[in-house]
Amino acid sequence: MFIIVDSLTGLSLRFARKIGYPVYQIDKDEIPFDQGEFFLITRSFNFGEIPISTIRVLRKHYQKCIGVAVSGNRNWGTNYGAAGDKIQEIYKIPLVLKFEGSGFEHESEIVKKYIEERGHE
């Protein structure tokens, strides 16, 4: 089990590192897709769109993704974290969490618990 993160400013990367699993960045690291399932942490941009870099990963590997957490800005109202809603709808990947910035400690615990409950300790 590992985490893939799509982070523009580094805040989502900081959130990902709090969870306690190996972290790989889209477009920066060699991602070991052959090592099984992963959890995705991505972001919304343009008021709720899915980043192209995330779409490229999901098109090829969505079957191995057990869940997604998405960063966003609450100032966007109904578009807050909307990329996560779209990923859930298009790829049928459970949206586990929406968070702002680098998230709070209790939010990273939500993701960690979700992963552990699926037998990925």
Residue ranges and their predicted role:
Residues 35-121:
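FMN-binding flavodoxin-like domain, especially the glycine-rich phosphate-binding loop
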Residues 1-51:
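N-terminal beta1-alpha1-beta2 submodule of the flavodoxin-like/Rossmannoid cofactor-binding fold
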